[in-house]
Amino acid sequence: MYILVQHTISEPAVFWNAADPNTLSPQLKLHHTFPTPDGTHAVCIWEADSVDTLRNALEPVIGRVSTNEYFPVENREGFARPSRVPQAATAGASSR
C-alpha cells in the first residue's frame, strides 16, 4: 500500500541526517520526498504493508524531532481520485 507521511520538523538538521531510508527494512520503500527549502516540513510517499509497519519503523528514528501524520493513499498512473468519493456523471467530461 502507498502511505503519505506529513512531517512537521522541529530540528531539521537532526531529522534530515537521521532520515536515511537505506538503514530501514527492505520491506519499506521510499518513493518521493518533498521537503520545504528550510527543511521544517515535508511530505513523503512510502510503500509498505501497513501504516503501522511504517510508523513503527520511522517513529524511533525521527519521532523525537518531528510530528508525523500517516495516511493511506491511492495511486494509479500518478493520478487517482478517492475511491470512496462518488464521481458525478459530468466529472472529467469536456465541453466541446
Specify the residue positions occupied by each region the protein language model found.
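Short S/T/G/P-rich N-terminal loop/turn motif that feeds into the first structured element of a domain
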Residues: M1-H41, E47-A57, S66, Y70-R96
